[in-house]
Structure formats: structure tokens, C-alpha cells
């Protein structure tokens, strides 16, 4: 009304934080974004327990490696040995009553963009990328969830990248024995690249397409430690 030009530096891309769950809309519309599990918590046993079928992954130490025995649980139940038993862990629902989402899961970032940015496009139209200059993302992360960070296709991607099955060395992510340094390096490389490919690249591509400068910050005070 006063003939003034007002530029908005950036929009906030989330209901609260961390970015990615769209205030609960992403988990509500895409249950697989959270209900597949995000971590693997383990416990050791000197005898395979009778409830071993409750675990997602059961390993038996043999020499310097670990063998998956999920298909042989009846054979080893009650048998002494060194067993590593893994259960899936999940994000909690403190985010406005909704779970955070697995940014490593295929399609989650695209769903977030669809829900959040399409809403902004409907509201602001051509002002998005002109009057509104950028987008701020707040603490998107893939932090540990009571154990080893994991996503359903992680083992397959890891083996394609490094040529060996991570499950045969999984305990070395928390125990310092054998070739643990190489295993941890490879694990973090795969984990970080998945985060780049499945979160950062789709967000960057969208912002570039819409002439938006993308800024913000990751969970630097708590991840990846």
C-alpha cells in the first residue's frame, strides 16, 4: 500500500524441528517412513535364548567373524556360544505426537517436499523464488536410535559398495577387535552417502529448480556422535 518492496530472506520448512516430518503429515501419509525401524540395539548372550525369534537378527561368533543364524534358531536354542542378538528400535512420538521419519528411507524426502513445498507454492505462487529468496532447514538428522543406525536396504547398499556383508562384522561397530577400523570407516561412509543422496540432493535439486537459496543447519551438536 505504501509502494514498498519487501523481500523475505527465507521460509522455515518445518512445523517445529527437526526438518523432514512436516509436523506429522509425512508419517501420517507415509507410514513406512517410520514403522520399518531406524536402529538396531543388541545384546550378548552366552546361550541362545528360547525367545530368539523375537529378535530381528541373530549372529553367532565363529572365529573372527559372525554368522547369521536366523534360519537355524531351533538348532542353536539352549546351546552355549557367543551370540549377538539385535532388535529394531524406533523413533519416539514426541514430535507433536508424531514420530520423526527415517531420512534414509527411499521417498521420504520427496514426500516431505510434496507436503511442505507444494503448500508453500499454493500460498505464495510466483513470489516463491523471487520475493521469497530461500528456505531454512532445521536440524534434519539421522542420529543413533538406541543402537546402530540402520534402514531396511542398508545391508544391501553396503555390500554393493564394499563387497562384503556387514552382518558378518556388525559387532565390530561397537567392539574393538579384528578389522574394526575398516568396518567402521566403511559403515560411516555408506551412512553419510545415503544421507546425502536421500536427503540433501533432493532438497538441493528442488531449491535449485525453484530459484531458492537453501540454508539451515544439521544436528551438529549431537550427530554423528
Residue ranges and their predicted role:
Residues 1-185:
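Mature extracytoplasmic enzyme cores
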Amino acid at each position: 500500500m505504501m509502494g514498498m518492496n519487501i523481500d523475505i530472506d527465507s521460509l522455515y520448512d518445518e512445523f517445529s524441528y527437526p526438518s523432514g516430518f512436516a509436523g506429522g503429515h509425512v508419517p501420517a501419509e507415509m507410514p513406512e517412513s517410520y514403522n520399518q525401524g531406524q536402529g538396531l540395539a543388541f545384546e550378548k548372550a552366552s546361550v541362545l535364548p528360547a525367545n530368539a525369534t523375537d529378535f530381528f537378527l541373530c549372529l553367532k561368533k565363529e572365529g573372527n567373524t559372525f554368522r547369521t543364524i536366523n534360519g537355524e534358531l531351533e538348532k542353536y536354542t539352549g546351546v552355549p556360544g557367543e551370540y549377538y542378538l539385535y532388535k529394531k528400535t524406533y523413533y519416539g512420538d514426541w514430535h507433536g505426537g508424531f514420530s520423526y521419519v527415517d531420512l534414509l528411507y527411499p521417498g521420504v524426502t520427496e514426500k516431505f517436499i510434496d507436503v511442505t513445498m507444494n503448500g508453500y507454492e499454493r500460498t505464495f505462487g510466483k513470489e516463491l523464488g523471487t520475493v521469497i529468496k530461500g528456505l531454512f532447514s532445521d536440524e534434519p538428522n539421522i542420529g543413533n536410535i538406541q543402537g546402530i543406525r540402520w534402514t531396511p536396504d542398508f545391508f544391501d547398499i553396503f555390500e554393493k559398495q564394499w563387497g562384503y556383508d556387514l552382518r558378518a562384522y556388525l559387532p565390530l561397530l561397537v567392539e574393538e577387535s579384528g578389522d574394526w577400523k575398516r568396518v567402521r570407516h566403511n559403515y560411516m561412509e555408506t551412512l553419510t552417502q545415503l544421507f546425502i543422496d536421500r536427503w540433501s540432493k533432493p532438497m538441493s535439486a528442488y531449491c535449485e529448480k525453484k530459484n531458492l537459496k537453501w540454508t539451515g543447519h544439521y544436528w551438529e551438536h549431537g550427530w554423528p556422535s
